[in-house]
């Protein structure tokens, strides 16, 4: 067990803070909840603290919760491939570019680390080149979320990982908005981290609303499990 992994043996409180600017529409979001890496479970509630969110909530899910991939459940035979926990408590910087097909892009930079007993994800998001009447700024996405696989590989030069995946957002007219994600994670501290063999995270997310919440918000339940490296096949993945 890495030193960082020891911090995730029970339920851990999570705080998420995001400052965003999409096509000049500025906004802030604050999220709170908890994670349980034993089950790969996240329960979070996000509130737009600046009024109405200028983009659809589902477009921010990967920035919020795929940002705290340290809560992914890694099976025993894969624990030596868990970069995310091994970088704790100092944490990691997570940088991402998200390309929305036939529309604009988000660039995000997050610092994910422990502050006391709380796992904090602080994010800056900049969005450019979005069409004002497109699926994103035109709010044409359904309020739901599909399951996805997130592909991880080691980046030995930067002592971190590279991650890529494609998200399918459901549109109200029955079509799909694709979003390509390119992600880089590098440790903040200078201690040893685990550099993984290629594998993936399987994610299931459910969005809901709090009937008692008057502010613009999103409630998220998510399960994340690492997979792709099987027992006794280590040689194939070297």
Curated annotation (Swiss-Prot):
Q: What is the effect of changing residue 145 to F?
A: In Sapphire/H9-40; exhibits a huge Stoke's shift, with an excitation peak at 399 nm and an emission peak at 511 nm. In Azurite; shifts the excitation and emission spectra to shorter wavelengths and increases quantum yields compared to BFP
Q: Which gene encodes it?
A: GFP
Mutagenesis or variant effect for residue 206 to K: Abolishes the tendency to dimerize and leads to monomeric fluorescent proteins
What biological process terms from GO does the record include? bioluminescence; generation of precursor metabolites and energy
Q: What is the effect of changing residue 64 to M?
A: In RSGFP4; increases fluorescence and shifts the major exitation peak to 489-490 nm
Supply the InterPro entries for this chain: GFP, GFP-related, Green_fluorescent_prot
Record note on modification: Contains a chromophore consisting of modified amino acid residues. The chromophore is formed by autocatalytic backbone condensation between Ser-65 and Gly-67, and oxidation of Tyr-66 to didehydrotyrosine. Maturation of the chromophore requires nothing other than molecular oxygen.
Name the chain's protein: Green fluorescent protein
Q: What is the effect of changing residue 69 to H?
A: In P4; leads to no detectable fluorescence. In mut2.2; shifts fluorescence lifetime from 3.03 to 1.94 ns. In mut3.3; shifts fluorescence lifetime from 3.03 to 1.88 ns
* Recorded consequence of changing residue 222 to G: Suppresses the 399 nm excitation peak, leaving only the longer wavelength peak at 475 nm
Subunit structure of this chain's protein = Monomer.
Q: Does the keyword Magnesium apply?
A: no
Q: What positions does the cross-link 5-imidazolinone (Ser-Gly) connect? A: 65-67
Residue numbers bearing the (Z)-2,3-didehydrotyrosine modification: 66
What domain of life does the native source organism fall in? Eukaryota
What role does this protein play? Energy-transfer acceptor. Its role is to transduce the blue chemiluminescence of the protein aequorin into green fluorescent light by energy transfer. Fluoresces in vivo upon receiving energy from the Ca(2+)-activated photoprotein aequorin.
Q: What is the effect of changing residue 176 to A?
A: In mut2.1; shifts fluorescence lifetime from 3.03 to 2.50 ns
Outcome of altering residue 146 to I?
In ECFP; leads to cyan fluorescence, folds faster and more efficiently at 37 degrees Celsius and has superior solubility and brightness
**What biotechnological or industrial uses does this protein have?**
Green fluorescent protein has been engineered to produce a vast number of variously colored mutants, fusion proteins, and biosensors. Green fluorescent protein can be mutated to emit at different wavelengths such as blue for BFP (when Tyr-66 is replaced by His), cyan for CFP (when Tyr-66 is replaced by Trp), and yellow for YFP (when Thr-203 is replaced by Tyr). Further generation of mutants led to more stable proteins (at 37 degrees Celsius for example) with brighter fluorescence and longer fluorescence lifetimes.
Family per record: Belongs to the GFP family.
Tissue specificity as recorded in UniProt: Photocytes.
How changing residue 128 to V affects the protein?
Answer: In EBFP2.0; shifts the excitation and emission spectra to shorter wavelengths and increases quantum yields compared to BFP
Question: What would changing residue 167 to V do, according to UniProt?
Answer: In P9; increases fluorescence at 475 nm excitation. In R10-3; matures to the red-emitting state with excitation and emission maxima at 555 and 585 nm, respectively
Outcome of swapping residue 202 to F: In H9; increases fluorescence at 395 nm excitation
């Amino acid at each position: 067990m890495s030193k960082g992994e020891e911090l995730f043996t029970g339920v851990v409180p999570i705080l998420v803070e995001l400052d965003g600017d999409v096509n000049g529409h500025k906004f802030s979001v604050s999220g709170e909840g908890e994670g349980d890496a034993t089950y790969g479970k996240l329960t979070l509630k996000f509130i737009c603290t600046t009024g109405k969110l200028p983009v659809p909530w589902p477009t921010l899910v990967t920035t919020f919760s795929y940002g705290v991939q340290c809560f992914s459940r890694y099976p025993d035979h894969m624990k030596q491939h868990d970069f995310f926990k091994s970088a704790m408590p100092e944490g990691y910087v997570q940088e991402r570019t998200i390309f929305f097909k036939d529309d604009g892009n988000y660039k995000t930079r997050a610092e994910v680390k422990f502050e006391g007993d709380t796992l904090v994800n602080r994010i800056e998001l900049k969005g450019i080149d979005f069409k004002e009447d497109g699926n994103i700024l035109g709010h044409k996405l359904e309020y739901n979320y599909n399951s996805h696989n997130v592909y991880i590989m080691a980046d030995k030069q930067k002592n971190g990982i590279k991650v890529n995946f494609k998200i399918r957002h459901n549109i109200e007219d029955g079509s799909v908005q694709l979003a390509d994600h390119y992600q880089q994670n590098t440790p903040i501290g200078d201690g040893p981290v685990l550099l993984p063999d290629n594998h993936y995270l399987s994610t299931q997310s459910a969005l809901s609303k709090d009937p008692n919440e008057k502010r613009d918000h999103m409630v998220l339940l998510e399960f994340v499990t690492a997979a792709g490296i099987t027992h006794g096949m280590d040689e194939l993945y070297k």
